[in-house]
Amino acid sequence: MFDFASYHRAATLADAINLLADNPQAKLLAGGTDVLIQLHHHNDRYRHIVDIHNLAELRGITLAEDGSLRIGSATTFTQLIEDPITQRLLPALCAAASSIAGPQIRNVATYGGNICNGATSADSATPTLIYDAKLEIHSPRSVRFVPINGFHTGPGKVSLEHDEILVAFHFPPQPKEHVGSAHFKYAMRDAMDISTIGCAAHCRLEERQFQRITPGIWCCRANADSLPTCRTDCTKCAIKPANAGSYQRICPARCRPAFFMAGQ
């Protein structure tokens, strides 16, 4: 049995925000894949729960007429993987989502929970970074939009106040031609393991040069990082085999790995 001190199921987003504001000790429950573990271990910091699982405001994948994309924070990883819009526009995010745990977890774990948990092994962080996403965050005071770059402030730490809720991810219109993106995950085991290293990259080509390249790396760093100096160094570089060694050296030189490994 879970030892709840209080449990509230929010009916609306406004209701959830008010419940958080009224109870400084409350924790949000969406997919629950991390929260339920804490409850199972009788973590005293998780005795007051606000359930936001069924809030319509946190659901849906919507493509606007201008090409911008909104993904609700309670979207599950299975929904991300299977949606034709994300498959077409955000392939690196779909690849990262596919690498997370097993099907049972992906069916319930949410995109927003993976980002807000602040774990250094969060597989969705680097693809969110390379696509220049902004986070829509609601509180009793305001609605703010913040870039994903800088949202993570340290292991298990994010720039989110107690009474704030991540409602959605907003992606700018993605170029339709001469672009590519990819995600890579290294784990100690292939099957359902957390990341030791997670990286992704998004690039746009023009006349056989990198017109724009955005790398992202995490797990071996305390925070998700877009490596801005690496972005500068690689932009305008000619794409040819002779430069491959230079590309391979640039990112590790800028990475400054964290002092720990994820999962240890």
Show where each model-derived region lies.
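C-terminal structural segment of proteins
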Residues: 1-264
